[in-house]
């Protein structure tokens, strides 16, 4: 890596033989130069008389094999202008520059460029930004879905590792601070890794124009092509296939009203703890999890295949009879009166309930209420009946949809990805295909719940602006889109079916149940529950075979074999292992010990949190005692950073760690500071647990 020199850059660019490919965006033909480039910065965060101040002290840029670095923004701006002049780039002729976690670099440099367009997934979360110079910055982090170290580890054509520990971020550095060869190598490799990663993406997609923006976009592209097109060219070579699928989509439409109901009905995975076990140190705890839970229900269950139709007769008797009908599903509002949990676990999410009267809440879940209103599916209703008692229920805004298996191209896409994930693991020479299929099978569900009406976030006059989308307009665009291959209600039922499957385990395991998280359960007395596990596994396999029969698919597709000949059936409970000790303090808060300590605590680094707890305790028991509702970890031991966005120009005299003082100017920045972590329970949850301990909550009854 060399220090940036304009003439050396020009000499290198002149030596390149670059082709151009074209892509249409909003009907306009855009030229892209087939060249790989990446950019990264190193920054310092400090405080001056209590004022947070952050700035860039080193940047690294790579284009193919040319890697250079600089120490101030003026050098980088000159480099960008040199690229523009050499390639004659503009909004219609572009060069893509990948940045790993673009949102971070963007905050430091957004005032330095004139922006043609900024596409962001959220406020301050840009993933594609086009300058008037024709330089298009893209985020490689949201494409890979992995941090830089894991991105490097997963490379299959290149052998390169992220340097770790070679750059001490606690030291104050400025553009005048000397950097050692080791420190510069750290900076160089961060850019080289991204270049290697994008080269592998180009090898896969053949051109930079075909690389999706996001990891979810990758699987979306793959499944869409299988649904709408034939052959690898993805041209409409089979007109009947394209038109048949388009006809299906034209019959699967929403209105603004049904879309809003879908939004209310949608819930994610179920994560919670048995309140009877919270705070206890439990021994010999077992863990089971579903193999590919969401893909399994996408294959085994039936989904809405008609436009939602409102029905009038909504008495309880009529509705419960409707729920028993085959090949129909429902979404609706339900008002429950005098509803109380009859289990040590609670299903209804407080955030999904409205008009609550005298609710008692168990860590975000409804334990009891005099009355409440919620929007649910018929699948949710059956779970509620199994785990709550209620005096009455009133239904309203009920919509009925005919159900059938998902279209065959979606089914075969999922099966193909699962087969590759299973059969290619550990096969020499197939690492890239294995990693791709593994990432895509995990993203299949995500594409099914992508929101139709999203806020638009962009930069206007260097200010972030959020624009509300017009629901009617977006729904109309959705209904008439010729590229659409999904139906939003499908995703709603994916999670509903997955929750039902999880709750089959919670209910069957009963008092031995401890904790669940989306697709896994922790519990006691494994031997006592083996019959349930075996029965469930036979049941889900039977359902998957029914789907195979329907589409004339081989049974081997739902249970492919590894390269060692071991069958890996889809959707079954898989035994994860036994923990010597386990303790939970609520959702996303648990600790277990097998031969080492492990923690999952929302907001706390797993590795650094474990290291700190170990450093404070002399025994395993001490570690579990330390993990309590008053646990506090100092800033130096959490691995957490507080991000402070600074949009104002600042300049200060800064003295670096070597004693060198210089005037530093910063147009905008992100200040990072270590922050402490304190584990605490909400007052409402503490009160609920106290009521249970004191006997006010017992056997499905709340005593005043």
Locate the predicted segments by residue.
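N-terminal accessory regions of nucleic-acid-interacting proteins
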Residues: 1-37, 41
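Short hydrophobic beta-strand that contains or immediately precedes a catalytic carboxylate
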Residues: 37-40, 137, 285-288, 294
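Short acidic, Gly/Ser-rich segments with clustered Asp/Glu that frequently serve as metal-coordination loops
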Residues: 41-49, 290-296, 520
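Electropositive, glycine- and tryptophan-enriched low-complexity nucleic-acid-binding patches
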Residues: 55-74, 473-482
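Conserved DEDDh/DEDDy metal-dependent 3′-5′ exonuclease domain
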Residues: 63-173, 185-189, 193
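Short active-site loop/helix that positions an aromatic residue
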Residues: 106-114, 148, 199, 291-306, ...
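Catalytic palm active-site di-aspartate
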Residues: 189-190, 287-292, 441, 512-525
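C-terminal, non-catalytic extensions of nucleic-acid polymerases
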Residues: 198, 202-278, 304-309, 340-514, ...
């Amino acid at each position: 890596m060399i220090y940036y020199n304009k003439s050396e850059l020009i000499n290198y660019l002149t030596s390149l033989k670059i082709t151009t490919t074209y892509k249409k965006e909003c009907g306009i033909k855009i030229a892209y130069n087939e060249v790989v480039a990446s950019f990264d910065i190193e920054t310092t965060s400090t405080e001056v008389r209590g004022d947070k101040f952050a700035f860039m002290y080193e940047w690294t840029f790579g284009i193919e094999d040319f890697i250079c670095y600089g120490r101030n923004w003026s050098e980088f701006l000159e480099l960008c202008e040199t690229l523009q002049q050499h390639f004659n780039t503009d909004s219609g002729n572009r060069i893509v520059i990948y940045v790993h976690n673009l949102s971070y670099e963007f905050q430091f440099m957004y005032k330095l460029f004139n922006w043609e367009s900024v596409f962001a997934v959220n406020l301050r979360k840009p993933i594609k930004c086009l300058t008037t110079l024709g330089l298009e910055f893209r985020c490689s982090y949201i494409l890979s879905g992995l941090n830089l170290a894991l991105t490097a580890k997963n490379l299959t054509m290149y052998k390169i590792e992220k340097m770790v520990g070679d750059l001490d971020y606690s030291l104050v550095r400025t553009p005048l601070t000397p950097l050692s060869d080791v420190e510069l190598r750290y900076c160089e490799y961060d850019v080289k890794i991204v270049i290697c990663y994008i080269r592998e993406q180009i090898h896969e997609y053949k051109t930079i124009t075909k690389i999706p923006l996001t990891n979810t976009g990758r699987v979306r592209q793959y499944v869409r092509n299988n649904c709408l097109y034939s052959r690898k060219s993805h041209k409409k070579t089979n007109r009947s296939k394209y038109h048949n699928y388009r006809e299906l989509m034209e019959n699967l439409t929403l209105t603004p009203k049904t879309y809003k109901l879908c939004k209310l009905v949608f819930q994610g995975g179920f994560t919670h703890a048995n309140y009877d076990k919270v705070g206890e140190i439990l021994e010999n705890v077992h863990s089971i999890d579903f193999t590919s839970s969401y893909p399994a229900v996408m294959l085994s269950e039936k989904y809405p295949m008609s436009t939602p139709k409102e029905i009038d007769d909504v008495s309880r008797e009529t509705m419960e009879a409707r729920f028993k009908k085959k090949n129909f599903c429902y979404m609706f509002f339900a008002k429950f009166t005098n509803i109380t949990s009859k289990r040590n676990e609670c299903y209804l999410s407080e955030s999904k309930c409205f008009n609550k009267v005298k609710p008692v809440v168990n860590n975000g879940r409804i334990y009891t209420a005099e009355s409440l209103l919620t929007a649910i599916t018929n699948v949710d209703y059956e779970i509620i009946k199994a785990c709550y008692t209620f005096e009455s229920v009133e239904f309203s805004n009920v919509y009925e949809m005919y159900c059938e298996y998902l279209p065959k191209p979606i089914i075969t896409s999922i099966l193909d990805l699962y087969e590759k994930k299973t059969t290619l693991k550990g096969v020499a020479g197939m690492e890239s295909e294995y990693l791709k299929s593994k990432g895509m099978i995990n993203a299949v569900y995500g594409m099914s719940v992508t929101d139709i009406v999203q806020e638009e976030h962009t930069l206007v006059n260097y200010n972030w602006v959020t624009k509300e989308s017009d629901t009617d307009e977006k729904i109309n665009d959705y209904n008439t889109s010729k590229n659409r291959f999904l139906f939003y209600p499908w995703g709603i039922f994916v999670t509903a079916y997955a929750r039902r499957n999880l709750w089959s385990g919670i209910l069957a395991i009963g008092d031995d149940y401890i904790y669940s998280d989306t697709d896994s359960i922790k519990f006691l007395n494994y031997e006592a529950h083996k019959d349930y596990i075996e029965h469930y596994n036979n049941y889900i396999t039977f359902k998957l075979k029914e789907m195979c029969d329907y589409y004339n698919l081989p049974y081997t597709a739902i249970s492919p074999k590894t390269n060692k000949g071991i069958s890996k059936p889809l959707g079954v409970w898989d035994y994860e292992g036994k923990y010597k000790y386990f303790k939970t303090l609520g959702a996303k808060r648990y600790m277990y010990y097998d031969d080492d300590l492990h923690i999952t605590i929302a907001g706390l680094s797993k590795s650094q949190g474990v290291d700190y707890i170990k450093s404070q305790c002399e025994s395993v028991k001490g570690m579990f005692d330390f993990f309590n509702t008053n646990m506090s970890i100092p800033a130096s031991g959490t691995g957490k950073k507080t991000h402070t966005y600074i949009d104002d120009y600042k300049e200060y005299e800064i003295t670096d760690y070597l004693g060198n003082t210089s005037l530093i100017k910063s147009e905008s920045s992100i200040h990072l500071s270590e922050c402490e972590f304190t584990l605490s329970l909400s007052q409402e949850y503490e009160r609920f647990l106290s009521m249970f301990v004191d006997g006010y909550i017992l056997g499905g009854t709340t005593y005043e």
